[in-house]
Amino acid sequence: MTNLSDQTQQIVPFIRSLLMPTTGPASIPDDTLEKHTLRSETSTYNLTVGDTGSGLIVFFPGFPGSIVGAHYTMQSNGNYKFDQMLLTAQNLPASYNYCRLVSRSLTVRSSTLPGGVYALNGTINAVTFQGSLSELTDVSYNGLMSATANINDKIGNVLVGEGVTVLSLPTSYDLGYVRLGDPIPAIGLDPKMVATCDSSDRPRVYTITAADDYQFSSQYQPGGVTITLFSANIDAITNLSVGGELVFQTSVQGLVLNATIYLVGFDGTTVTTRAVAAGNGLTAGTDNLMPFNLVIPTSEITQPVTSIKLEIVTSKSGGQAGDQMSWLASGNLAVTIHGGNYPGALRPVTLVAYERVATGSVVTVAGVSNFELIPNPELAKNLVTEYGRFDPGAMNYTKLILSERDRLGIKTVWPTREYTDFREYFMEVADLNSPLKIAGAFGFKDIIRAIRRIAVPVVSTLFPPAAPLAHAIGEGVDYLLGDEAGAASGTARAASGKARAASGRIRQLTLAADKGYEVVANLFQVPQNPVVDGILASPGVLRGAHNLDCVLREGATLFPVVITTVEDAMTPKALNSKMFAVIEGVREDLQPPSQRGSFIRTLSGHRVYGYAPDGVLPLETGRDYTVVPIDDVWDDSIMLSKDPIPPIVGNSGNLAIAYMDVFRPKVPIHVAMTGALNAYGEVEKVSFRSTKLATAHRLGLKLAGPGAFDINTGPNWATFIKRFPHNPRDWDRLPYLNLPYLPPSAGRQYHLAMAASEFKETPELESAVRAMEAAADVDPLFQSALSVFMWLEENGIVTDMANFALSDPNAHRMRNFLANAPQAGSKSQRAKYGTAGYGVEARGPTPEEAQREKDTRISKKMEAMGIYFATPEWVALNGHRGPSPGQLKYWQNTREIPDPNEDYLDYVHAEKSRLASEEQILRAATSIYGAPGQAEPPQAFIDEVAKVYEINHGRGPNQEQMKDLLLTAMEMKHRNPRRAPPKPKPKPNAPSQRPPGRLGRWIRTVSDEDLE
């Protein structure tokens, strides 16, 4: 199912090929295991548009062979005319015997213009019909859209320049190979004789029966009288056979019959014919039997066949005008389409219709078909074939994804631009390790995550020897899925986990044990004898076990270490940090090869493996320890890393080693520790704390140690022991103290070519840092420079600033930036940073912090009410909400902590129904219907009010119900003849006439009479 050698991706090749056929073929991971070869075949056609500018392209997206579809042009009379068949570039039967279709996609669009046309016109409708071509009742441009009600199987009015893409999705699974109708050696007199081996499995059979005792009667005509005895719809694009018998009875002497079978295409024209009887004379008074058995090869099926008919031509030897001709007929026939019932062969069909395209334009059909092919004996001499790989995890994942395709937005027909945009989404679906960011934007994330949870555990049932390993990682499946999920304690521990050990490709191991975690804990050891802690093991098998990604289940303490790549002695090129785990004992088999064989001694003479042999570690330990790099942390286990990490140099892990030596925890401590513990019991600060802080946060961990960041545990060992919680339940309740703002670049991972000489945290570097601090106390300018460096380091932009300095050697751009920077107290600074004008940029809480604060508030409120089980972790698992009434009742009755997201409806008493009195209902109906003095409410309205009281269990209507009742009352009043007459509305006063304008005293005004 996946590629275990890839640490970042777990691609399911089959579903990737299904959704994106242009990525190439992939073997179908079912249990049909035959040696085959994979091949991609292209199909490219330039179809010329007819005079009407309309046409139809019929695709058979699931047909297992060279046939892709057919093209029809529309004539002026409104009928379609067959143009040509659409095939793959290579004729597969010429070189291969058997075939299975893996995936197929085709694109239809136009980008050319004929002479004299200056605009690209025309639109496209496309639909996938879950039936055969002959079953379509309306094939017009608009009628096609009614062929299905599924919105994911049709699109309309797509511009012909944009085009549509047809995607083939499987209609069935676990299918066998289909014979292609390949030519076979034939022995005959004619060297042109051709023999083929056609598919015989899954035939489609049509049985056609004539009406009982069909009677024919007519007068003689020169040339005979033609009638159609049989006519029925069939579907065929490959070879077929027709067999049956007819029985004729007549009382007329000298009748002669000619019978012909016609295969009719989709456009109504004849594809091919076969004579059943030629000049057969009927004997009067007896049953005249006419049997037939016809075979029509694929070579004669030049276009899709959609119907069959049997015509009878009746004549009479020596007949004269006016002679009577009559007979009775009965019988039946059967049409067998070889391979016609193979899923995808004849159904479904996809129809792409175009309209109003300029005459003479070219419509391009281009696509790819991916096959599993078994070559013929001649080609097999030079072509290597391989078995397919049975991978039920990949097969089940594909089936589950496609079973939810309507909810996941996976269509069979697409606008080409939309399909291109969805390719990134399809890559997420095919990659089990993807974080589902695009799927989350579309709302499909939860569905795919649920499907992954179902598909991944297949490993446990398929490989029983690997079942202990599958059970050991069971609690961490959510993290293996590559997305954040809540652990048992409510905190997302490892949001970037990789599905490495759950892919169904685990090597079988000769192990025997009662508990899975014992097997896992010892799986990666190389014992001196075959018995390890009572577990019978095979050393030969275990020696190769280090190639597997390990889920280690035992106690450990964690600490981050900074890794740099350097160009010279003091110029770092890139900065990164890695999390390490301290494990008790000598466990070099768990380390990457780059760390093995390297150790450092402690003051007590014990060894710490994984450190470079540089002096003595200033600690006294009671036993040996091993330091291993890790990728992820879960509740009670860690995932080891196989990255080429060099041996460690420096004192960053002293605090974690000392804690491991004193307390010896049984599970991993879910708090990273950093600090250099010296021989006097003092905890010294370490460098690059912001980089280490970002590394801890990426794994969902807090960072403990001296300094004002995350958990300040004091300046000495005694204070650390006093402040650090030793109960695992208290780890998640540790606050994030003074959590700095991490820019987006803080989460970047750098690809480092790491070697032991490149590890930069050395005693010499620490001595240099102390020397710089001493120089800063004397030289103010150097103090400023050191402050700038520490500011860059704490904000995680040292590398970015170093790269900027390389691009600005004379600091011209930096001077311009500083000259134009806002001044202290300016309006822009006050708007951005507040009244101070300077300081750390204000920011609101992150979604995770806000959610955590909400959970804490709900928990404190519940605790004040005496509900002590509602801890912040429980509230988070309960969907970030407090306990429901059912959960409270369950806790009160059983005193057991209820399961989150379980409502316990059995513990909630059903609401008692109260019946309202008739007087109460009448009073409410009268009040709602109208004011006193108006007509009484009709009985129909009283019944409506009674229904509301019944729905509300005796309570009155709510706001929405009151609105509905008022509208009902208004409607009833308008049609009630007994309603009170409406009061007349007062008429507004007529506006006074506008006085004439003020004129001069000597100017005479002109009236209407003067004008007359």
Curated annotation (Swiss-Prot):
SUPFAM superfamilies: Positive stranded ssRNA viruses (SSF88633)
Annotated positions for site Cleavage: A441, F442, A487, A488, A494, A495, A501, A502, A512, A513, A755, A756
Compositionally biased intervals (Basic residues): 975-986
EC number: 3.4.21.-
InterPro entries in the record: Birna_VP2, Birna_VP3, Birna_VP3_dom1, Birna_VP3_dom2, Birna_VP4_Prtase_dom, Viral_coat
Region (Interaction with VP1 protein): 1003-1012
Annotated positions binding a divalent metal cation: D30
Record protein name field: Structural polyprotein
